[in-house]
Design a protein with these regions (language model features):
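Outer membrane beta-barrel transmembrane domains
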Residues: 138-142, 148, 206, 296-394
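Residues that define the transmembrane beta-barrel architecture of outer-membrane proteins
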Residues: 100, 112-116, 164-170, 212, ...
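Residues on the lipid-exposed face of transmembrane beta-strands in outer-membrane beta-barrel proteins
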Residues: 100, 106-107, 118-120, 170-176, ...
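Outer-membrane beta-barrel translocator domains and adjoining extracellular loop/strand segments
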Residues: 130-135, 195-201, 239-242, 249-257, ...
Length: 394
């Protein structure tokens, strides 16, 4: 048993070290500096520098905000894989449910007094679109000039951006009482950015700028608490709260720079092998205030295996969305200028999740899942896989 613990600790230390070692020597500028260089230095003469600058800054700020928002709101594992209760008839502690619970949606059952867990999750994400616009194929137009009545511009500047994140999150849960538990998540993030800006004038392409940056470090730490108000077998109701602390580097887009608080209500119903779970909450402060909601269906496929499907949603208030504006050129008759900028508006973001929880041995729990966006709001990847290992202490 001692050897196993040493191996686990070494594995965790190695994974975190590899992330923190990612700051390369040639990326002395911050990620936000490189992003600003790629987005704001537009070269097409439009005759209106002020509007050009305003649109470029708004675009840069929106892309930065959406990246930080994605890192800050990427779902983290729910607590309570193993749940326990005292059986008065037997006078001993037994499993409160045969199910290992949802993936990201919280459930009302708690860990139990004196119970604790420690785990590590890993996720690697390559983002390929933002607000429905491709980031990687060179079709993201920053500025363009077009003759009125034509279908294609004669001078167009496009941006290509490749964002990739690798995240290792250390998770822990402690049961304070049978009705109260506390958990925390500590993310370590490696962020890579590569991009270029290309001008296409009447079919002649010229690379205007290119750049890359890489950084790694601590993200925003999450602390949660759940309190069980009512329990009937494996069903019940609970209230919870989540605090995200601004521990990530804001300049390198690893953190939000502000504390957010999310109170939530949690409900669960379990009957035989099937469970239905739901939660609703509201995020205050942070990158954007948001109504959050989630629902999950769990099925005990075998004594050691739980299958899970979930729907996760957020209604974001005044989040920036990329839009194109078209205005007449102030000096050239019959020519319009197209600019990429942003507009603050309320937007809905939905994710569907499928995965499983497998009790591989003793109280070791392996969780594997994949997320798929159902809307084009914000920064998106086609698929977001993640794997988590948890150990529950007896």
């Amino acid at each position: 048993m001692t050897t196993g613990r040493r191996y686990t600790g070494g594995t965790i230390a190695f994974a975190v070290f590899m992330l923190l070692a990612a700051r390369v020597a040639d990326a002395q500028q911050s990620v936000s500096d490189v992003l600003s260089f790629l987005v704001t230095n537009r070269s097409i003469p439009t005759g209106d520098f002020v509007r050009d600058e305003q649109a470029a800054i708004a675009t840069r700020d929106t892309i930065s905000k959406l990246l930080v928002l994605e890192l800050a709101t990427l779902p983290s594992s729910s607590g309570g894989g193993f749940t326990y209760r005292l059986d008065p008839a037997l006078g001993t502690v037994i499993r409160a449910s045969d199910s290992f619970g949802p993936l990201f949606t919280e459930r009302s059952l708690l860990a139990g007094r004196g119970r604790a867990s420690f785990g590590m999750s890993f996720s690697s994400v390559s983002y390929d679109n933002i607000d429905g616009r491709s980031l990687r194929d060179g079709t993201l137009v920053s500025t363009a000039s077009i003759f009125r009545g034509d279908t294609a511009p004669f001078d167009v500047e496009t941006i290509t951006l490749k964002f990739r994140t690798d995240t290792v999150t250390l998770n822990g849960t402690v049961g304070i009482t049978d009705q109260l538990d506390i958990s925390a998540g500590i993310p370590f993030i490696r962020l890579n950015l590569e991009g270029e800006r290309v001008d296409n004038y009447r079919g002649q392409q010229l690379v205007q700028a290119s750049g890359s940056a890489s950084t790694a470090g601590l993200g925003d730490i999450v602390v949660r608490a759940r309190y069980n108000m009512y329990r009937a077998g494996a069903s019940g109701m609970a209230v919870g709260a989540e605090v995200r602390l601004p521990t990530g580097n804001e300049e390198d887009l690893l953190g939000t720079g502000s504390t957010s608080f999310t109170p939530r209500f949690i409900g669960s119903y379990e009957q035989d092998r099937v469970g239905i779970h739901g939660e609703v909450g509201y995020t205050l402060r942070g990158v954007s205030e948001a109504l959050t909601y989630a629902g999950a269906v769990t099925a005990v496929a075998a004594p050691r295996l739980t299958l899970v499907g979930e729907l996760l949603g957020r209604r974001l208030n005044a989040v920036g969305r990329l839009v194109e504006t078209t205005l007449p050129h102030p000096r050239l008759a019959g020519v319009d200028t197209v600019r990429l900028t942003s507009s603050d508006e309320t937007a809905d973001r939905l994710l569907v999740v499928a995965g499983f929880k497998w009790n591989i041995a003793s109280t070791w729990l392996l969780t594997a899942n994949v997320l798929r966006p159902l809307t084009d709001v914000g920064l998106n990847a086609r698929w977001v896989p993640s794997v988590t290992f948890d150990y529950w202490f007896d």
